[in-house]
């Protein structure tokens, strides 16, 4: 299993980015509109960590890993068969690939296909 995107939703984007940058020696870029205005940095071994503000007033802070999969439709079907509930069906993000979100065990889980 490989995390392709680690999404961190927080009301303190700059503070979180500064703490991660200081502790890990990474640099966060400018907000990426395609990723909800997340500021991103490279993960060791590939992928990105993205820190963004909530997109709506009701969105709670969350840390959500997106697992890299070869077939996102099949992966979503497998998650549902295992008891997961689809929170966001597969959707294309131009230039980034496709993502989906499901909830299982009270946690958000993401899937990502390049």
Language-model segments: residues:
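Core segments of cupin and vicinal oxygen chelate
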Residues: 1-47
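Vicinal oxygen chelate
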Residues: 4-8, 29-30, 76-77, 82-114
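A generic "binding-loop/recognition-motif" signal
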Residues: 12-13, 72, 107
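Short amphipathic alpha-helices within nucleic acid-binding modules
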Residues: 16-19, 73-78
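Conserved, structured core segments of small domains
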Residues: 43-61, 65-69, 80
């Amino acid at each position: 299993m490989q995390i392709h995107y680690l999404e961190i939703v927080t009301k303190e984007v700059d503070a979180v980015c500064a703490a991660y940058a200081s502790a890990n020696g990474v640099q966060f870029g400018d907000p990426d509109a395609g990723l909800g205005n997340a500021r991103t940095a490279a993960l060791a071994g590939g992928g990105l960590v993205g820190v963004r503000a909530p997109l709506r007033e009701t969105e709670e802070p969350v840390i959500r890993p997106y697992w890299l999969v070869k077939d996102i439709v099949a992966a979503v079907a497998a998650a549902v068969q295992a008891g997961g509930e689809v929170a966001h069906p597969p959707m294309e993000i131009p230039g980034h690939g496709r993502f989906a979100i499901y909830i299982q065990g009270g946690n958000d889980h993401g899937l990502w296909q390049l």
